[in-house]
Amino acid sequence: MYKEGVYFSDITRHHEDSGYKVKAISRLLFPILSLQKIPVDSYADVGCGSGGVTKAMKEQLKVSGFRTKKIEGFDISPHVAQLKEEAIVFKMADFTTEGELMDLFTLTNVLEHITEPVNFIAGIAHKAKIIAFHIPLDDCLNVHFRNLQRAKIKDPGHLIFLNTNSALNLITQSGLKILDYDYSFETLSAPSNNETNLQKIAFPVKLLISKISPCLLAKIFGFSLVVIAKNEILNDLGQAS
């Protein structure tokens, strides 16, 4: 589906949600970078898709005062050859085998498409100082009750179904240290979450539950999780130098 270019036959797929995802990531990421005085001279977006997150994060780094010299977007789908943006290099490549050491990585809505997520994260982790994840939580009552697993496997190609604990466990098992996590409140308003009449009717209910207990919302309707993690070895080496 991905390597053949079928998934991104429309190269703008999910582009409209990119800004919401970056806002959610930035809320956790930039206070950590500032507090720990972590420079971001290089940044890679793994599984860059339409390139929307890569572009939005480039702008966010700039307005936050980072002078990021090297920015790359990686995807195994051939559509990346059509993506163009000043100061960003888009590559059709598997980052786990071809990527270089980077200060910052983002993986937005990627893990659910991977059959061996621990090995995949570990393959990236040894090249990363900081990794920011945005992870859909599809292991919820809404999916179970409506028997949506089959449909999600077919499109959008979700191969595993995660909840809050299993997502955090995958990241820890990959050898990374979790610095912070929170639910992606910003993406409740994203276009893809407000397309159908049913979604529009459910929106105020979701919003109310999210204010009372985001964990409960994740268990009932599903949600997305933002996780910021670091490679302690690379960060220690950077501080020593």
Task: Mark where each language-model region is.
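Conserved helix-to-beta-strand junction in the class I
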Residues: 123-127, 134
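Short aromatic-enriched loop/helix-cap "lid" or pocket-rim segments at secondary-structure transitions
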Residues: 83-86, 142-147, 190-195
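Residues lining the SAM
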Residues: 108-111, 134
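Short, glycine-/aromatic-enriched active-site segment of Class I SAM-dependent methyltransferases
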Residues: 134-158
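Conserved catalytic loop of SAM-dependent methyltransferase domains
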Residues: 179-206
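Di-metal (Zn2+ and/or Mg2+/Mn2+) metal-binding site signature of metallo-dependent hydrolases
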Residues: 113-116
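Short alpha-helix
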Residues: 159-175
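Conserved N-terminal segment of class I S-adenosyl-L-methionine
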Residues: 1-102, 108, 118-123, 181-184, ...
